[in-house]
Amino acid sequence: MNHFELFDLPVALDIDLVALKANFLKLQQLHHPDKALDKDQALIMSSDINQAYKILSQVDSRAAYLLSLKKQDHHLDQSIHDFEFLQSALEIREQLDEADSQEQLITLKNEVKQWVDGLIREFKIDYSDEDWSEARDTVRKLRFFQRVLNDIDKAEDQLLDEDSFDLDDDF
């Protein structure tokens, strides 16, 4: 049984994330180790459910998983060789490093999401055309942008923490 089947979802890049979460919670409750007769088996199943959920909940890992189902997930850890993409990636990283306001981070996040949307469209075409080399390259780019989005979230949290605690505040 693949991860999509586990959560009763179609094998596709576009999935219903609300249904994924709901099915995840149902399965976790059903296979909770504290409620099972065979605790070891339930623990293994619970771990498998968690791993499958983690993979399907992010578009980059979901795309990589789709490639794995087609036995086309080799060399996903190779470097990206698209010079234009690398230049853009460097610029985005620099913008993130220099961002010092919530507004700048929101603008950057929106820009990155536009990139991701374009890459999702590319992946769907590559996948349906069975252009595995291009699909793998697109997954590499999606992974990069997922890391950038995670870093933007961390930067937003840091800014919020800095704004909420000021040494000049009176206690």
UniProtKB/Swiss-Prot annotation:
GO biological process, one term: protein complex oligomerization
Database matches in Gene3D superfamilies: DnaJ domain, HscB, C-terminal domain
Family annotation (InterPro entries): DnaJ_domain (IPR001623), HscB (IPR004640), HscB_C_sf (IPR036386), HscB_oligo_C (IPR009073), J_dom_sf (IPR036869)
PROSITE patterns hit by this protein: DNAJ_2
Domain (J) ranges: 2-69
Annotated GO MF terms: ATPase activator activity; protein-folding chaperone binding
Annotated SUPFAM superfamilies: Chaperone J-domain, HSC20 (HSCB), C-terminal oligomerisation domain
Keyword annotations of the record: Chaperone
One Pfam match: DnaJ
Domain of life, source organism: Bacteria
HAMAP family, A to Z: HscB
Assembly notes: Interacts with HscA and stimulates its ATPase activity.
Function: Co-chaperone involved in the maturation of iron-sulfur cluster-containing proteins. Seems to help targeting proteins to be folded toward HscA.
Family from the record: Belongs to the HscB family.
The protein, known as: Co-chaperone protein HscB homolog
Name of the gene encoding the protein in the UniProt record: hscB
